[in-house]
Amino acid sequence: FNPTEAIRHVIVNGMVDYKSNQFYPTPESIVNDIEMYVGCTDGKRILEPSAGRGNIANRFENIHCIDKEELNTVILKQKHSNVICGDFLFYEVKKETDKYDIIVMNPPYNKNQWKTHVEHALKILAEDGVIYAVLPSGKESYFDNCEVLETYQNEFERTGITTCLYRLEK
């Protein structure tokens, strides 16, 4: 990782306001579980729609990343070639073959943004695709074909929230 571009961005634009942007990096213990459950990704189209600094994305090759914070995308581009700076909720795929086989996500939680993000992810998920999502606990009843894989307490610093790793299918 070459920090030159990231430092230049911070000097010009300042740091990201983490709280208002709902930026809570995915802890390594959860990332390890995501990687284990996803398994082999050969030949699969993979997306992380709220990629942040790449805690999840860095575990996968040829992953597509989206983040709305420019600083995060500057950092992501150091390791990944398919990076978009923009709001995931406005991201669309042009044709059926552009849909994703696997979507790994830790979306923002504030004001039920997690629900909107998962609903949008389902729209761009391939017919036999799978979503692995880190969400607040107790959300499995919101979606069909949703399974709790793991439960985590106090994994995200200064939040006190219980989260789960969910597996969703279309």
Please place each PLM-identified region on the residue numbering.
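Class I S-adenosyl-L-methionine-dependent methyltransferase catalytic core
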Residues: 1-170
